[in-house]
Amino acid sequence: PFTKAHGARNDFLLTWRSQLPPGLDDLAAAARTICNRHTGVGADGWLLLSPGSGEANGAIELWNSDGSRSEISGNGTRCAAALLVEAGLAEQDVNIATGAGLKHLRLLAREGRVFSFEMNMGAAAVEELRATIEDRDCVILNVGNPQCVFFVDHFDFEWPALGARVERHPSFPNRTNVSFVRVLDRHTLEVRFFERGAGDDQTQI
């Protein structure tokens, strides 16, 4: 059994660990199967939820659609928070244990099964401010998972293909998420994402 949810069109299948079929040991293969958009249900990732302990209302384990593990997804964590609230395991304040540590979310609004959360991802750690990958300038960050950020003037190029190459670039032994950022004005950015283990996840902000 699963619930399907999305945050900014980044979609996930969510399953309670206690409801996994007995004997299901190869979670990587299961993730690839159910996340396949042609032969499975289809999703960018699979989240396994467990009841929390201590400060945490719940805990999540994230599997990408290619069967790899990831520390955290901000969108996925918000989806998990919605399920915890719906299950009565949390109310306005939600604490979730992730592979990148304990994350705090606050429920801002709810309309039926549509939830709006504010989430503290923590400070971004700049690992390299002026890097060059694939002959392009970029910034390398860590926000609980690795990020490579390119500033672009437009999106009229094969940015998903570039994202796929950068994801597996030798500079990133554990692979990386890739973001392409266009500055519209001092207050507005347009962003496209190539997600590690999932590819172009359709999120546009």
Question: Can you name each region flagged by the protein language model?
Answer:
Residues 132-159:
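Internal active-site segments that recognize and position negatively charged phosphoryl groups
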Residues 49, 130-133:
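Alpha-helix C-terminal capping segments
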Residues 125-129:
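Short, charged/polar, Gly/Pro-enriched secondary-structure boundary elements
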Residues 1-113, 149-205:
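A glycine-rich beta-to-alpha transition motif near the start of alpha/beta enzyme domains, typified by
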Residues 113-121:
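Short, solvent-exposed secondary-structure boundary/capping segments
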